[in-house]
Amino acid sequence: MTPLHRIEERLHSLTVRQAIGLVVGANLFLVALAFALPADGEMRGPALLSVLGNFHILALHIPAAVLLVVPLFEFFERHEQATATVRRLSVFSAAGTWGAVLCGIVHAHYNGFSGEGIQLHLWGGIAASAFAGIASLLLSQGFLLRLVGQLVAIGVMGFAAHVGGELQHGEGFPFKPNKKIVADSN
C-alpha cells in the first residue's frame, strides 16, 4: 500500500467531528502563530527560520494551481460522490495551502516585513487555508455543494494572491503591463 493510500484511509476513517477538528485546529494554529510571530518590520535573519520562510514563494504556487484544477475535475466528471482524483487533489491543495501560509508567517516575521498590505495578505492567506480545508470537508457532500465550496476557496485564495502579487510587483498587478514592456515602449 502506498503512503498516499494510507493517508487517504486515515482521513477517510475520521468522523465528521474529527475532520472538522483537524481543519479548525490546523487553522487556529496558524492564527496563533500569526500573533506569536508578528510581521512588525524587524529584521531577524539570516537564520534557519528566515531561510525556511523563503520557501513561502515556492510553496504557494503548486497548491494554488491544484486548487484551481479541482473544480474542473468536478465539473467534467459530474459524479454525485467525489472521485478519488478530486479527493486527493482537494486534500493536497488544502494541506499545501496550509504549508504555504505557515512559511509565509515565518517569512514575514524573520525577514522584516510590515504594513497594512502584509497584514491583508497574511489574514487573506489564513482565510484561504481555512476555506481550502472547508472545501475538503465538503467532499462527502453532493456535487453542487462541493463545487460551490471549491469556488469560494478559489475566490478567497485569489484575493490573498492578488494582495501578495501587488506587494511583490506593485499596485495594479496582474492587470497592468510588465515594467520592462512599458520601459521598452518609451
Label every model-predicted segment.
Residues T2-N186:
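Polytopic transmembrane helical bundles with strong interfacial aromatic enrichment
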